[in-house]
Amino acid sequence: MSDIIPVFLGADLNCYNFARAFHEAYGVESYAYGRYPMAPTKYSKIIHFTTVPDMDNEDTMLRILHEFAAQHKGKQLYLFGCTDDYAAMIIRRKAELTEYIAPGPAADLYGSIQKKAEFYEVCEKFGIPYPDSKILTAPVDAAELTEDKLGFAYPIIVKPSSSVDYWKHPFDTMKKVYTAATPAEAAEIVKTIYASGYPDRMVLQKMVPGGDDHMRVLTAFSDENGKVRAMCLGHTMVEEHTPHGLGNHAAIVSEDTTSLPLVENIRKMLEACRYTGFSNFDIKYSGIPGDYRVFEINLRQGRSNYYVTATGMNIARLVVEKWNDGGTDCVLNKNEVFWHHVPAQVAFTYTEDKDLVARAKALKAQGKEACSLLYKPDLLWNPVRYACVLEQLRRQFKKFKTYYPVHK
């Protein structure tokens, strides 16, 4: 398998998790390109990162990738985007990247489901519950956002329908997701986002009760024929709470995937759409038995994808061995593993569900635990990387103390 060469666009934890999976499975090193280096991949021996300041320009991307392919003729090249923007670029220009195997949905399908508003329309067809929502196409007065007009009570969630377009229009108070306590606050958030130049729809949504530990994450892999070949459910312990990182998983306990009532409907939806590649769903349990609400679909592997690999379902092997093997089997993970990218003690301290903490501690005691950055082959005889990783982990204590005070 030495002919395998993974290539990533991005340098974040998503990139490191996937590169680690390839290294574990096949002993190969990965290549990555991005606009700037990032801590999760700095000084790594398993990733060769190159800074390209305008890597978000599609013509630059094509030039770099064609040059790389020309230098590695005869190799089995795999290409993945590690952010929404990079994934979208690859999907749009996939027809011009024939040197690579680039698992991902067709461009027309991408256009129809990557935005939350459109995705909810698809969910309707397949009986997949999502939070009650109001869609806006422009700023409105607070009088139009009363509870009577919305059909649900405050506080509410406010977020852009298109994450890709949203992050292209930065402003000082920018957040990944917003909470509004009053109609006036909701109207002001919407006004500010549209004033930045954001061109798409806005989603105002009923708040689903419960903390981070009510969240679930579902990862699916579909082969080139649109058959779902693997699914893995994770129970979120705690998420990041920095303004730009809000909602990113910090610790997950993987669970029996068959325990999620929505799994079969989601599989049917993916296959009916002939979806290909990785998909990642954010889901929340409302506290009512059996009531789970899907928030969104990410049309790529998730940032926390190592929670899947840690169960034994190595995501690199899924791509290499199931993408075009002609099979139809679908493996649903049932193994429990405690995954985290923050120190375990941070996860234990800030997870409010103490029964879930007890499960995670038991898994840790059994050796069923994985921390993305603590990869021995990348740390051995690599003191600078080791120091960098320790510093990243150390800083998590301050981040959580600042942005997520312990609930007493």
Predicted regions and their residues:
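Active-site nucleotide/adenylate-binding loops and adjacent lid/helix of ATP-dependent enzymes
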Residues: 112-203, 224-225
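A short glycine-rich, hydrophobically flanked beta-strand micro-motif that places a catalytic Asp/Glu
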Residues: 205-206, 276-288
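ATP-binding N-terminal substructure of ATP-dependent carboxylate-amine bond-forming enzymes
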Residues: 1-105, 140-145, 389, 399-406
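Short glycine-enriched loops at secondary-structure junctions
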Residues: 34-39, 84-86, 224-227, 234-237, ...
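A short beta-strand motif that forms the metal-chelation/ATP-contact edge
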Residues: 290-300
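ATP-dependent carboxylate/phosphate-activation module, predominantly the ATP-grasp catalytic core
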Residues: 175, 181-184, 206-274, 298-323
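Peripheral (often C-terminal) accessory segments that flank ATP-dependent C-N-forming ligase machineries
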Residues: 321-408
